[in-house]
Every structure is written in structure tokens, then in C-alpha cells.
Curated annotation (Swiss-Prot):
Protein name, per record: Chaperonin GroEL 3
Catalytic EC class: isomerase
Keyword Nucleotidyltransferase included in the entry's annotation: no
Origin organism lineage: Bacteria, Pseudomonadati, Pseudomonadota, Alphaproteobacteria, Hyphomicrobiales
Disulfide bonds: none
Assembly and binders: Forms a cylinder of 14 subunits composed of two heptameric rings stacked back-to-back. Interacts with the co-chaperonin GroES.
Organism listed in the record: Nitrobacter hamburgensis (strain DSM 10229 / NCIMB 13809 / X14)
Family statement: Belongs to the chaperonin (HSP60) family.
Protein location: Cytoplasm
PANTHER family, per database record: 60 KDA HEAT SHOCK PROTEIN, MITOCHONDRIAL
């Protein structure tokens, strides 16, 4: 076991505070509409330019191990806020720095750290309650666009695009962000259910120009196992041919002979057919096939249900108004499933999302939910250079997370106004213990930090802005840093999701409380590298030995 370096009390807190300041100072310059960019060196390729707080925080590692511990604890604030709310990481970092700074001063003045933490927690709970009271539900698509615009640093085009996507796919729908090959940024809405499996043979193509197989009013056969021969389903195929409708076969795999027979029938024109592999793997594949069965009003042909392939009749098949299959994806539009059954399935998936502890499982369940409940929208981000595209993609992802948070818990006045107004709620708290009261006062002062930083990044004196906003008793009155004027924030569309503001404060108070109560720090001593050995002499030439 290697030797350790141990620091105590004031020495430990001072070095930790230096680390907190280095990280927070790098992150907080990005806050607000006039926040600056941070350029990050990459080990390969061009440097990355970003205004995303958590991206900056994740890149910072300090040489001094004690300073680095302080920095990493604040980085944890940004990461936690990002995981929970998807935005507000810079606000959380600014709040954490403000609470830690004041807390360290109070401890140095001889106050009890545990009582200080108790006070910080009491005040944080009061702010959370106050934000919950102030939050107003998102009533219109215009408000969704406003939230998106604010979170993407005033880019109205991004705000409108996200609002358009959310309107189309609903709040449960999946919206993904991809890089575009062109200069344009656009939205592609996929209606119906899409899964990432394409046709098994190009001979199934019906539209040679687009290289897609399009089946109108199709029957859909869903089979859990491999199809190695068609003997068992010949009566079914004959019934489908008589109906004159096309058929989509979805199975684990369709092997050589069966596939060749389908292709020959397709080319001869007797049977309009296409075949694709089932999406997913293992248990997830079965669940996705059941989703498709419920969406199309069909039945999954599975041994578990005791249904043999030879006993399948036409009324067991799913139906859809249209199926479009390309080389990589299959899209089922307007399935004939009963609304009641689909809603029950959606409820079941939501319950699984609540219960799961795995982030990966949660993500996959949410994708399934979206495909059943809403649809899928893809925002393709374009730009002149790769650096620009990456920077814009960061902002689009932030804006998307913020709008989702706004839909969940409502909106509050933006620009740090909601936190500043929460001072009134914290100011009402009185505690007999002076150290607990000092903890409450630390949060009271820290609530000014975000609006001060937004103002200072815009080149305006923060104290003057705080004073003017507090002078006016209108709850929604605040400072528009973009135009450097005092306005009604909600009327101007400068709004923040309540969830983002709440999470930022909770996470900042939680980690800052731990930092304040730190009394000792333990780090590994840096290892001394041994000096490299002398290279071999190898004799001197020309000496004649």
C-alpha cells in the first residue's frame, strides 16, 4: 500500500476551496445569454468550443490532489444536475461555489460545521417549496419554444424546432439529436413505429427510385422464432393472396429456402410480400414484438402462448394502413390496435420505467414507450465546420432537456429571478441556534449568485441588478441580460423550467454541505520516478582494443 498525504482542518479546506474556485470560475463564464465560450484542447483533432457547463466541468483535472478533490466534488454537482434535469449545470456550479465559500468562512470563524449544514438543508428545502409554488404549467407550444430558446442561448430557430418536434410526437415521444452532413439544421418527424431492421432482400423493393418496400393496408405476421421453411404457413399465404393485401413477415430470422421462396413469389407477382428480422435481442426482442402485436392488433406467434405456426389464421395477423421498409429501418404507420390495449401497454411500460435502476434499461424502455405513445423526431444539426456542429449540438441537447423538464414540473421566471425571489421565503425562517441560522443565511446570500453572474457576464454590475430587481415587488420582474433592460420576464418569454432550478439548488446545497463539513483529506503521495539508467557505453571507436 502506498504512502498517503493527510491534511486537516483549515489547511484541507483552503486547498479544497482553491480547487472549487478553479473549476467554478471556468464553468461560470458560460452562464446567461452573454456567457462566453470555453475552448477545450483535445488529444486528437481540433479543439472543442462549448458553452455547456457540464462539458467544461468534465474536462477539468488538477495537478494538486487536494485541489483536485474539491474540483471533482463540484464536478459531481454539475453531473448530478445534468443527469436529473439535463440542464442547469452552470447554475448549480455557481450556487455550490457561493455556498462553499461562505461556509468555509463561517467554519474558520469558529462555527459548528454540522449546524451550518443543518441550516443549509433547512434553507434549501424552503427554496424548493417556494419554487414549486411559483411554477406554472406549460400551456402552449410558444412557451415550449421560449424555454428551448433560453436554454440554447437565445437561438430562436432551435427553440421553434424543439416546439415543433414536441408538438408532433407528444411529451412521451422520443426526440433524438444527430449531426447533419449539410449546413442546414432540420427536423425529421417519423410517424408510427420505427425499428432498426431493414428488408432481408432488395428484391422486396417496390419503389426502385427510393429503394423502399411500401406495403399499403398490409397484414403483419409476427413470429418469435426462425422461419426455415414455408410449408407450415402455406394455407395462410394462400388466404392472404386471396385477400389481395400485401404481407409483412417479422421473425427472428428467415433462412435461405424460406427467403428464396418468398422472393420468387414476390417476383412472379402472386404474393405482395416483404420480410424483416425482429428488432432487439433476447427478452427485449420478445417485448418489442409484443409491442408491435398490440399496436397492429395482431398476435405474436410464440411457443409460450401455445400457438403453432400451422394453426395461424388471417385474423391472428396484425394490420397497418402503411408499412415502409428501407435498407436499415421499418416503419409501421397507423396500426389497427385497440386504443384501450395500447394505453394499457403504455401504463405497463411506465411502471417498469419507475421500477428499473439501470440507466440503459430505462433508456430502452423510454424508446419503446415513445414508439407506442407518440412517435420519433430527429433533429439534424448542421454547420459549416465540425467544431460549429458540435457546439450547436451541445446547445440543442441542453434546450431539449430543458423543455422536457418544463413540461414535467412547469416554468418559473428565468435569468436567476426565481432564486432571487425565493429569498423572501428563506428570510422568514428563524432558528434559535446561531450556527444553524448562519447556515440559513449562507443560502440566503448564495441565492443572489446566479443573477449576479449573468449580469457580470453581460458586463453589468451584479449588485446594482440585484438591488433593482428586489426593489420592484412584481414577482416576474427581472433583468434581461441580452438587451440589458429590466422587464417582466414571463411576458418577455425569459423562463426556466422549475425542475432545472430546483435540481440545481438541491444538488449544490447537498455537495456544498458535505464540503463544509470536511475536516480531513487523504490523498496518495506522488510517486518519485526513478532516474533513467545510463545508456550502455558500448566502447569508443578507433581505440584499437
Amino acid at each position: 500500500m502506498s504512502a498517503k498525504d493527510v491534511r486537516f482542518s483549515g489547511d484541507a479546506r483552503d486547498r479544497m476551496l482553491r480547487g472549487v474556485d478553479i473549476l467554478a470560475n471556468a464553468v461560470k463564464v458560460t452562464l446567461g445569454p452573454k456567457g462566453r465560450n470555453v475552448v477545450i484542447e483535445k488529444s486528437f483533432g481540433a479543439p472543442r468550443i462549448t458553452k455547456d457547463g457540464v462539458t467544461v466541468a468534465k474536462e477539468i483535472e488538477l495537478d494538486d490532489r487536494f485541489e483536485n478533490m474539491g474540483a471533482q466534488m463540484v464536478r459531481e454537482v454539475a453531473s448530478k444536475t445534468n443527469d436529473t434535469a439535463g440542464d442547469g449545470t452552470t447554475t448549480a456550479t455557481v450556487l455550490a461555489q457561493a455556498i462553499v465559500r461562505e461556509g468555509a468562512k463561517a467554519v474558520a470563524a469558529g462555527m459548528n460545521p454540522m449546524d451550518l449544514k443543518r441550516g443549509i438543508d433547512i434553507a434549501a428545502a424552503a427554496v424548493v417549496k417556494d419554487i414549486g409554488k411559483r411554477a406554472k404549467p406549460v400551456a402552449s407550444s410558444a412557451e415550449v419554444a421560449q424555454v428551448g430558446t433560453i436554454s440554447s442561448n437565445g437561438d430562436t430557430a432551435i427553440g421553434k424546432m424543439i416546439a415543433q418536434a414536441m408538438q408532433k410526437v407528444g411529451n412521451e415521444g422520443v426526440i433524438t439529436v444527430e449531426e447533419n452532413k449539410s449546413l442546414e439544421t432540420d427536423v425529421d418527424i417519423v410517424e408510427g413505429m420505427r425499428f432498426d431492421r431493414g428488408y432481408l432482400s432488395p428484391y422486396f423493393v417496390t419503389n426502385a427510385e427510393k429503394m423502399t418496400a411500401e406495403l399499403d393496408g398490409a397484414y403483419i405476421l409476427l413470429h418469435e422464432k426462425k422461419l426455415s421453411g414455408l410449408q407450415a404457413i402455406l394455407p395462410l399465404l394462400e388466404a392472404v393472396v386471396k385477400s389481395g393485401k400485401p404481407l409483412l413477415i417479422v421473425a427472428e430470422d428467415i433462412e435461405g429456402e424460406a427467403l428464396a421462396t418468398l422472393v420468387v413469389n414476390r417476383l412472379r407477382g402472386g404474393l405482395k410480400v416483404a420480410a424483416v428480422k425482429a428488432p432487439g435481442f433476447g427478452d427485449r426482442r420478445k417485448a418489442m414484438l409484443e409491442d408491435i402485436a398490440i399496436l397492429t392488433g395482431g398476435q405474436l406467434i410464440s411457443d409460450d402462448l401455445g400457438i403453432k405456426l400451422e394453426n395461424v389464421t388471417v385474423d391472428m395477423l396484425g394490420r397497418a394502413k402503411k408499412v415502409v421498409i428501407d435498407k436499415e429501418n421499418t416503419t409501421i404507420v397507423n396500426g389497427a390496435g385497440k386504443k384501450k390495449d395500447i394505453e394499457a401497454r403504455v401504463g405497463q411500460i411506465k411502471a417498469q420505467i419507475e421500477e428499473t435502476t439501470s440507466d440503459y434499461d430505462r433508456e430502452k424502455l423510454q424508446e419503446r414507450l415513445a414508439k407506442l405513445a407518440g412517435g420519433v423526431a430527429v433533429i439534424r444539426v448542421g454547420g459549416a465546420t465540425e467544431i460549429e456542429v458540435k457546439e450547436k449540438k451541445d446547445r440543442v441537447e441542453d434546450a431539449l432537456n430543458a423543455t422536457r423538464a418544463a413540461v414535467q414540473e412547469g416554468i418559473v421566471p428565468g435569468g436567476g429571478t426565481a432564486l432571487l425571489r425565493a429569498k423572501k421565503a428563506v428570510g422568514r425562517i428563524a432558528n434559535d441556534n446561531p450556527d444553524v441560522q448562519a447556515g440559513i443565511n449562507i443560502v440566503l446570500k448564495a441565492l443572489e449568485a446566479p443573477i449576479r453572474q449573468i449580469a457580470e457576464n453581460a458586463g453589468v454590475e451584479g449588485s446594482i441588478v440585484v438591488g433593482k430587481v428586489l426593489e420592484n415587488k412584481t414577482e416576474t420582474f427581472g433583468f434581461d441580460a441580452q438587451k440589458e433592460e429590466y422587464v417582466d420576464m414571463v411576458a418577455k418569454g425569459i423562463i426556466d423550467p422549475a425542475k432545472v432550478v430546483r435540481t440545481a439548488l438541491q444538488d449544490a446545497a447537498s455537495v456544498a454541505g458535505l464540503l463544509v463539513t470536511t475536516e480531513a483529506m487523504v490523498a496518495e503521495l506522488p510517486k518519485e520516478e526513478p532516474a533513467p539508467a545510463m545508456p550502455g557505453g558500448g566502447g569508443m571507436g578507433g581505440m584499437g582494443f
